[in-house]
Amino acid sequence: MRKIILIFFIFLILQNIYAYEKIYDVNHVCYYTLTSVELQKFVKTAEIITPLNADNKTTITKDTILVGNPEENPLTKKYIGFFKIKINKTFPGKNKGIIEKQIINGHTVILLAGSDIQGTYASIITFANLNDIPENPIICETSNKVNIYSTSLNSEYFRDFIEKNILTPKEIEKVKSLSYKLKGKDKKATIENIAKWVANNIKYDYDKCKKIESGKFSWDEYNTPSETVKTKKGVCLDYATLTSALLLNDNIIPYMLDVALYNTSSLKISSYHASVAVKIDNTYFVIDQQPYLIPINEYTAQTFEDNLRIASIVMFRVVKERDGIKLIKEKEVPGIAIYGDLINLLEMRFNN
């Protein structure tokens, strides 16, 4: 009997340690709830530390809103031990974030962070709709993602299609002679030659793009690398697969990028884009339909057509294996601009 009671008390203690309020789905959050004077005052006076400005901050000296998980924000990493929920890249999970209040150095600190950028988005949007500072941690999530006919590289099925039908050893071999023509005096020169050739010789296929957007499109209509060379046109994925094939033939590892783009007015993901990155002297450079290389930190800050910006990038290393080509997930790179836009939304919300 004592053993049962002891187990029950341990269960209660563990439940209390990890207790949090119900999971909020930001798709069902209304703009905006009435907020308490305390919450409004806190947000207006608190210092907001995001991955954009965390490098110059070494300690908490006033009421603070910490934005971003420990891998993105060094100040979050320093103080994560103070929080009940130890957020990381895998917990609470994809598209999930947390809101948690703690007292650190005598100051109120609110952590708004996600396992990924979509989780951070969920935590900020949910926090903006609270009517008071939460006493217990909140886990929130969003289904703010777009699956345009599953043409995102994050789809295992779509990657499998590319590996078996587009970037096959046989198809890569067909553009080998072109790769040799573009080979430069060193790795960087070769990459620059490939970027220039693709940008100058391949035109964007707007008709195919319209078909994709309308849904009147099948995967089989994507080009193989040799088809892109022959027709001299393609959409972003066609550019990316051709570029990857040319790089592979010159023994350069390409990284195909799955780029999630968000609308700056709604801050919601609206589409996905494909491009390629290469690594030169431990720095990633992006090749994206332009005759030059773009450092990835500059690329993540770009604004695209229709006022779209990068929410996040998932990198897939393209490798040759015995049985063919594999796209292996390398890492996720958060967009730079989205942090600023989310904080602007938060400040606008509480300055009204």
UniProtKB/Swiss-Prot annotation:
Transmembrane segments: none annotated. InterPro entries: Papain-like_cys_pep_sf (IPR038765), S_layer_C (IPR022651), Transglutaminase-like_domain (IPR007562). Belongs to the UPF0252 family. This is UPF0252 protein MJ1282. The lineage of its organism: Archaea, Methanobacteriati, Methanobacteriota, Methanomada group, Methanococci.
